[in-house]
């Protein structure tokens, strides 16, 4: 059984409860008649669902540094093969999540699926690492790319000061947090616009590339599978780069409870998004190779800029703006989705209860959104973020593979469970095996980094027993926790979701 939030013996519930009109009694607001229930609304349509998936998948990587795959494959042909295979494998994972999302109709993504199938301990470990390290570090990394590229047009002749990048990055992070705190609808609308910008940027690269092919610029595709020798032990790293570029297909499942008609919308949004992204990624890489050879691509710090300078002339100045908008879209979509993960984990008693509360008027999970802000700022101004993400990249695929393996378990354990969308069993089997295979080979290829990541992940086990299992916490601690919760409720104007009261 999942341990539910502890109900205080000191005060009634330990937190302030909103009245039927969604008002905190301590705020002294006059109650307007017929106000909506305080709960998250189903505002994610098919278009918004597609924009969430595409908007979070396509970040800066495809524009800045798709060379990670090429470095670890050794040839143009093998790199394009890896891009295609990673797209197909990501589609398999996404289809598996489509079945999980339409069978277990709860928000939270892999946290929820692991919780339902394998119990609270592995689910807690997943959200523990996500909250404290992975999500703040990942948000800081993509935000730094935003900061760098939004400033690039103003520093054409000189190096951009590192402090300026971090300051504008901090502003961008704050804007995203405020946007997601204030309105679900506006956040979704802006995500649609930013997704359109991403696809426009990709088309700006693909169309000239196709024209180059028509003109016969195919010299870089001759002997496509010959090139630098690359050990088979480096292929997992190529897959990591490829799969990382496709990461984001699972984010719609984080907001299942806010999706309109999820039984139809989730599978359809996933299929549309993955088809667009896979075709777009492969064609973008093909376009690069029509103008840039393998050696030049490996030396370039911003492949899209190099490509556009050669083919688009002065229009290449617009490329950094498109890259910055692409990064901003990934920031926005990631915060929108992951805040629901923290919201659900809090609702299940695995995070502080304030994180499962909703703003009485905006109907947004305000605390679950803003908790990321200080953590991301700490990551932004400290440490080597890339190394930290490398340490923990295996954990993402380990838990995603575990969640998809849970689908197979449910097929045999609960064969009569209602499944509006069902995939052939070989799809989740192949995907979960691939995830575990990548984790095993990463341990073989880079045991030091993977070992550090494994140790960091395991810190969630003692944390689980300390914060979740241990019920007999000191009275002073419980009193202090409740005072903090009530104070934050008043400041933030949040209450528990009405159906949970």
UniProtKB/Swiss-Prot annotation:
Similarity-based family: Belongs to the amino acid-polyamine-organocation (APC) superfamily. L-type amino acid transporter (LAT) (TC 2.A.3.8) family.
Modified residues (Phosphoserine): 26
Reactions catalysed according to its record: L-cystine(out) + L-glutamate(in) = L-cystine(in) + L-glutamate(out); an L-alpha-amino acid(in) + L-kynurenine(out) = an L-alpha-amino acid(out) + L-kynurenine(in); N-acetyl-L-cysteine(out) + L-glutamate(in) = N-acetyl-L-cysteine(in) + L-glutamate(out)
Protein name: Cystine/glutamate transporter
Mutagenesis or variant effect for residue 396 to N: Loss of L-cystine transport activity
Impact reported for residue 158 to S: Does not affect L-cystine transport activity. Does not affect affinity for L-cystine. Does not affect affinity for L-cystine. Significantly increases L-glutamate affinity
Transmembrane segments: 44-64, 75-95, 131-150, 164-179, 194-210, 235-255, 266-286, 318-338, 365-385, 388-408, 423-443, 450-470
GO biological process, one term: glutathione transmembrane transport
Originating organism: Homo sapiens (Human)
UniProt PTM comment: Ubiquitinated by TRIM26; leading to proteasomal degradation.
Self-association and partners: Disulfide-linked heterodimer with the amino acid transport protein SLC3A2/4F2hc; this interaction mediates cell membrane localization.
Tissue expression from the record: Expressed in term placenta and primary term cytotrophoblast. Expressed mainly in the brain, but also in pancreas.
Key word NAD present: no
Residues exposed to the Cytoplasmic side: 1-43, 96-101, 117-130, 180-193, 256-265, 339-364, 409-422, 471-501
Keywords: Amino-acid transport, Cell membrane, Cell projection, Disulfide bond, Glycoprotein, Membrane, Phosphoprotein, Transmembrane, Transmembrane helix, Transport, Ubl conjugation
Induction section of the entry: By oxygen in a concentration-dependent manner. Up-regulated by S-nitroso-N-acetyl-D-penicillamine.
Task performed by this protein: Heterodimer with SLC3A2, that functions as an antiporter by mediating the exchange of extracellular anionic L-cystine and intracellular L-glutamate across the cellular plasma membrane. Provides L-cystine for the maintenance of the redox balance between extracellular L-cystine and L-cysteine and for the maintenance of the intracellular levels of glutathione that is essential for cells protection from oxidative stress.
Lineage: Eukaryota, Metazoa, Chordata, Craniata, Vertebrata
Glycosylation-annotated residues: 314
Coarse class of the protein's main subcellular location: membrane
Effect of residue 336 to Y: Does not affect L-cystine transport activity
Resulting phenotype, residue 254 to A: Increases resistance to erastin-induced ferroptosis. Decreases sensitivity to erastin-induced inhibition of L-cystine transport activity
Activity modulation: Inhibited by erastin and sulfasalazine. Inhibited by (S)-lactate. Inactivated by p-chloromercuribenzoic acid and p-chloromercuribenzenesulfonic acid.
Result of changing residue 271 to S: Does not affect L-cystine transport activity. Does not affect affinity for L-cystine. Significantly increases L-glutamate affinity
Binding positions for L-glutamate per the UniProt entry: 135, 244
A cellular component annotation (GO) from this entry: plasma membrane
Reported impact of residue 396 to K: Loss of L-cystine transport activity
Topological category with respect to the lipid bilayer: Multi-pass membrane protein
């Amino acid at each position: 059984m999942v341990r539910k939030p502890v109900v205080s013996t000191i005060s009634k519930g330990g937190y302030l409860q909103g009245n039927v009109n969604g008002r905190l009694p301590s705020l002294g607001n006059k109650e307007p008649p017929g106000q909506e229930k305080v709960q998250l609304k189903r505002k994610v349509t098919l278009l918004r669902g597609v924009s969430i998936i595409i908007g979070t998948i396509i970040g800066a990587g495809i524009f800045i540094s798709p060379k990670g795959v090429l470095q670890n494959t050794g040839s143009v042909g093998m790199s394009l093969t890896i891009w295609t295979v990673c797209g197909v494998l990501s589609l398999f994972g996404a289809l598996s999540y489509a079945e999980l999302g339409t069978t277990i109709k709860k928000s939270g993504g892999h946290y929820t699926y692991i919780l339902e199938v394998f119990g609270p301990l592995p689910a807690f470990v997943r959200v523990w690492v996500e909250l404290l390290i992975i999500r703040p570090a990942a948000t800081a990394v993509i935000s730094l790319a935003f900061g760098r590229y939004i400033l690039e047009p103003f520093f054409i002749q000189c190096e951009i000061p590192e402090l300026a990048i971090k300051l504008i990055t901090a502003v961008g992070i704050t804007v995203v947090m405020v946007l997601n705190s204030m309105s679900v609808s506006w956040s979704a609308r802006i995500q649609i616009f930013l997704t359109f910008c991403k696809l426009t940027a990709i088309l700006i690269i693909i169309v000239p590339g196709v024209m180059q092919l028509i003109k016969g610029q195919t010299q870089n595709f001759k002997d496509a599978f010959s090139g630098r020798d690359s050990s088979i032990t480096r292929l997992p790293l190529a897959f990591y780069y490829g799969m990382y570029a496709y990461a984001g297909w699972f984010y719609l499942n984080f907001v299942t409870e806010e999706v309109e008609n999820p039984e139809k919308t989730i599978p359809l949004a996933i299929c549309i998004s993955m088809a667009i992204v896979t075709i777009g990624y492969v064609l973008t890489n093909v376009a690069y190779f029509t103008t840039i050879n393998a050696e030049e691509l490996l030396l370039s710090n911003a492949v899209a800029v190099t490509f556009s300078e050669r083919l688009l002339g002065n229009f290449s100045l617009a490329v950094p703006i498109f890259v910055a908008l692409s990064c901003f879209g990934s920031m926005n979509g990631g915060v929108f989705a992951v805040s629901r993960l923290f919201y659900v984990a809090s609702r299940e008693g695995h995070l502080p209860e304030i994180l499962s509360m909703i703003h009485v008027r905006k109907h947004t999970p305000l605390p679950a959104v803003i908790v990321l802000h200080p953590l991301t700022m700490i990551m932004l101004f400290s440490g080597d973020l890339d190394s930290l993400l490398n340490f923990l990249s295996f954990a993402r695929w380990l838990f995603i593979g575990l969640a998809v393996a849970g689908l197979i378990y449910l097929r045999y354990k609960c064969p009569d469970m209602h499944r509006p969308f069902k995939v052939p069993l070989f799809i989740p089997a192949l995907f979960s095996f691939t995830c575990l295979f990548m984790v095993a080979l990463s341990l073989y290829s880079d045991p030091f980094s993977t070992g550090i990541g494994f140790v960091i992940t395991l810190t969630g086990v003692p944390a689980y027993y300390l914060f979740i299992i241990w019920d007999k916490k000191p009275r002073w601690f419980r009193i202090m926790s409740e005072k903090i919760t009530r104070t934050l409720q008043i400041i933030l104007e949040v209450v528990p979701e009405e159906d949970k009261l």
